[in-house]
């Protein structure tokens, strides 16, 4: 009996702060994302843009987007396409229109030099007012196609930083939970992390049934 009580207490402690975080952003606020020509959006709050329709919608509060430069420059026979690595941008926004532009460059040589840097001077604004943001240049993997599994790389980055997105809304795991997860494994396939993710995506009724099942183990 003591073992059952301990198991229930363990799961309540494990998910308690997470459940609270999941209900932080219950009211949807109209925040749309637009970008300058040549700035490609790859992910919005953990969801691939292949699964989203435009204009992309953000939430009131913490947001994360993955973007890269994908731009044609030059004219005629000298016209070429330049690409940067994907960058993870994090920021907080309120209602309105959020706009992202890339730093300017005149030719491919300038672009290549700019893309070598770990950070770029992205121009991020909400309702025409500049806002602060964090950025991380995704390193990619070794080989000919370093970003072919970008979704897995993003999930691993978020896991190691204690960030999870449920239904397009950000959930931050507690520092203790995030540290514990990182120490146990650096893979996204951690059973503990899978359990956290599954619990976050449950309805209230499913959570009650789950906790009932846990108490019976």
Swiss-Prot record:
What keywords are annotated for this sequence in UniProt? Signal
User: Is the keyword Signal assigned to this protein?
Assistant: yes
Residue span of the signal peptide, if any? Answer: 1-21
> Among its keywords, does the record have Acyltransferase?
no
Name of the protein = UPF0319 protein VP1009
Q: Which domain of life is it from?
A: Bacteria
Q: Matching InterPro entries, A to Z? A: UPF0319 (IPR018635)
Q: Which family does it belong to?
A: Belongs to the UPF0319 family.
């Amino acid at each position: 009996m003591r073992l059952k009580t301990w198991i229930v207490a363990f799961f309540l402690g494990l998910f308690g702060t997470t459940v609270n975080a999941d209900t932080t952003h219950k009211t949807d606020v109209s925040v749309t994302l637009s970008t300058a020509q040549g700035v490609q959006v790859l992910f919005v709050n953990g969801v691939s843009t292949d699964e989203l329709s435009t204009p992309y919608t953000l939430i009131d509060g913490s947001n994360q987007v993955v973007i890269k430069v994908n731009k044609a420059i030059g004219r005629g026979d000298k016209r070429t396409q330049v690409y940067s690595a994907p960058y993870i941008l994090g920021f907080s926004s309120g209602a309105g229109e959020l706009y992202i532009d890339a730093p300017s460059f005149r030719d491919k040589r300038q672009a290549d030099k700019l893309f070598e840097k770990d950070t770029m001077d992205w121009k991020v604004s909400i309702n025409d007012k500049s806002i602060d943001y964090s950025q991380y240049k995704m390193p990619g993997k070794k080989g000919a196609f370093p970003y072919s599994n970008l979704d897995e790389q993003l999930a691993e980055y978020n896991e190691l930083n204690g960030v999870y997105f449920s239904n397009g809304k950000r959930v931050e795991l507690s520092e203790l939970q995030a540290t514990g997860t990182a120490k146990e494994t650096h893979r996204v396939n951690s059973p503990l992390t899978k359990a956290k993710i599954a619990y976050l995506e449950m309805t209230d009724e499913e959570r009650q049934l789950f906790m009932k099942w846990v108490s019976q183990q």
